[in-house]
């Protein structure tokens, strides 16, 4: 953001500070370290993080769901968003819990 504010040439192609565009990005949980996942949640919000598996490649986490469940400092709401709530919202589908509650 500093260069954008300080240099006119940095503003030639983008009208807003670079950090404002980060709000449009989504991140996945393939960070391999619970501290990094907690940082993503703190920096960008749990509503911008999706469960990642790295499938079909072999470099993913052995159990991506447990990784999210065991990451310290995440609320149950955070976990719910990351483990499917965000994907459901982005895809325009009802999360499984909402569908089951209607039965």
Label the model's feature ranges:
Residues 26-27, 31-50, 56-103:
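Mid-to-C-terminal alpha-helical segments outside catalytic/metal-binding sites
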Residues 15, 20-21, 38, 49-51:
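Generic detection of intrinsically disordered/low-complexity segments and helix-coil linkers/edges
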């Amino acid at each position: 953001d500093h260069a954008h504010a300080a240099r006119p040439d940095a503003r030639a192609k983008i009208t807003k500070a670079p950090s404002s565009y980060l709000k449009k990005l989504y991140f996945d949980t393939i960070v391999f370290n619970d501290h990094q996942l907690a940082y993503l949640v703190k920096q960008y919000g749990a509503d911008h993080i999706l469960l990642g598996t790295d499938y079909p490649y072999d470099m993913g986490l052995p159990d991506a769901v447990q990784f999210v469940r065991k990451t310290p400092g995440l609320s149950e709401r955070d976990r719910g968003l990351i483990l499917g709530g965000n994907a459901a919202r982005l895809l325009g589908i009802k999360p499984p819990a909402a569908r089951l509650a209607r039965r």
